[in-house]
């Protein structure tokens, strides 16, 4: 069923690759996880594969490591970043992820998505939900500071069809050109790499500070019983209550949810990044997009969480 890549039979995918001598593969993170988990467990190798591309949602280093165990020679997994309005704009390969950026991702620095593609300009600008009429260098934030990822180049779409309100929110005029605001948050490191920290609309603004989804979720995802997590905010912006929603790994829970909840709250308190998160909710199966089964619908989870807590 192409609408459920997370439930694919890994044997069928592996058999097709081996029988047809497949050299290139594109897979969503959910499918990559499903096939990689089976392949690593059964020590399967895919010698014909020269490159694997995974996109549609952030690809965790653990999924990359898992699938890489099946690859041979100099074959790598590439995780390009982009959107319908501009794709691809940034990319990175598995060797750099596993050797350099993985540890930082698991410590809550975000997911490293790599460096800009040639002939594209990518910059990080101040976070704002308002339209920006004209470009100014004052919009840029210093390296290391989280802001909105913005891009300028020939492959970026100029406007939306019949949607001037969307144009105003996404496009910034810059003399004869323009910048496109991706709606994603991230920061740039000293090597020019971009680190993805989640959607701008998904950030959780409490009375004290702003929390970003991908960095915070990484802390909870380190727990062996957690399949994936999602940070949501309950209440009005700048007065939101942060709630971490947890989807557990199937068939691997050996203790009660009460015990697990206490462990997760304790884990949050160990990290400055997550110390404000005191509410944990368990969800049986996160709502995800039909194409990739990887993009978590945090808006739906926020509605669910609010009902659970009311």
Feature-to-residue mapping (PLM):
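Gly/Ser/Thr-rich phosphate-binding loop
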Residues: 22-27, 36-108, 121
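Adenylate-forming AMP-binding core of the ANL superfamily, especially NRPS adenylation
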Residues: 58, 80, 92-94, 99-162
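AMP-dependent adenylate-forming
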Residues: 190-197, 202-203, 213, 228, ...
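C-terminal boundary motif of the adenylate-forming
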Residues: 134-136, 183-185, 222-249, 276-278
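Conserved ATP-binding/catalytic segment of the ANL
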Residues: 131, 136-213
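Short, conserved charged micro-motifs
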Residues: 251-260
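Conserved C-terminal "lid"/linker of ANL adenylate-forming enzymes
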Residues: 230-235, 243-244, 265-310
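Conserved AMP-binding/adenylation subdomain of ANL enzymes
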Residues: 1-23, 38
